[in-house]
A protein has these predicted regions:
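Short, well-ordered helical secondary-structure segments
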Residues: 3, 7, 11, 44, ...
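Conserved kinase catalytic-core segment
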Residues: 123-128, 209-259
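Conserved ATP-binding subdomain of kinase catalytic cores across diverse folds
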Residues: 73-211, 242
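Extracytoplasmic/secreted proteins, especially bacterial periplasmic and envelope-associated proteins
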Residues: 11, 15-18, 22, 126, ...
């Protein structure tokens, strides 16, 4: 396993531009290339060349065969948002291919609710349920993602919720704003919406991580990401399931208090 983590005194929240990141590192500073006939060994490994358990990865199915029930359950432990009470909308996402919002259930648990594209019902939510279990079995840290179906009676707006319009202007969110978001989401024959409810991770979100370099504000992050065996191992896994959206912008670093 990795050495015991050192305390992180201050860690900045990082925001990345997907377009800038792609253009800069494609045209300005392309990544390291292996010399002909040579290869660059992976780092962040033990004496046997295996990745070490820790903040990035841990041993699961390959080292200890998981049961069918464990594989089906994946990372899910807490459960889906409670259906016997209102979901309070505390923020909303209007940009991107699919809209979404953040809710608190009656237990005050935070979930990120994401929908399918209107043209492809069940596509994103179904693929997510499969992929999250594959990566969990491979040993990666993934969030709890639950498949939910709900109707408009489940939702209520929280106080002082703001939303951003197409011009980037923010205003207090109204019931009409919520209705306009949901107008772009397909419903089933029963009139309910199908979505993924992703449980908020414990700790302080620090934004996405990069697939190269290290975080200067994290004394535990000492192995360049492009040479980490666990991150290198993600490449064939993503290729296997055709996960072409596994970019930095879709990752997250979290500053956790416990192990």
């Amino acid at each position: 396993a990795e050495p015991a983590p050192r305390a992180v005194k201050q860690a900045a929240v990082r925001k990345l531009s997907d377009y800038y990141d792609a253009l800069w590192h494609t045209l300005a500073t392309p990544g390291e290339r292996q010399a002909p006939g040579k290869w660059t060994p992976a780092q962040g490994v033990n004496t046997l060349g295996d990745p070490m358990e820790g903040a990035w990865w841990e041993r699961r199915h390959y080292w200890r065969r998981m049961s069918i029930e464990e594989l089906k359950r994946g990372p899910n432990r807490t459960g889906a948002p409670a259906m016997d009470g209102k979901w309070t909308v505390v923020s909303a996402k209007t940009e991107g291919i699919t809209p979404g919002f953040v809710i608190l259930d009656r237990h005050k648990r935070r979930y990120f609710v994401k929908f399918d594209p209107p043209s492809n019902p069940e596509m994103a939510t179904g693929a997510d349920q499969i992929a999250i279990r594959i990566f969990y079995a491979l040993g990666y840290h993934v969030p709890e993602n639950h498949l939910v179906r709900f109707g408009p009676e489940m939702l209520e707006l929280g106080p002082d919720v703001t939303v951003q319009d197409r011009l980037g202007h923010k205003h207090k969110m109204t019931s009409r704003d919520l209705s306009e978001i949901l107008m772009h989401v397909s419903t089933g024959k029963d009139g309910r919406w199908r979505a993924t409810a992703s449980l908020g991770l414990p700790g302080k979100p620090l934004g996405p991580y990069r697939y190269f370099g290290v975080r200067a504000d994290d004394p535990n992050d000492v192995v360049p990401h492009e040479h980490r065996r666990d991150l290198r191992g993600m490449h064939p896994a993503c290729a296997f399931i055709d996960h072409d959206d596994s970019r930095s912008i879709n990752t997250i670093d979290v500053l956790a208090d416990g192990p």
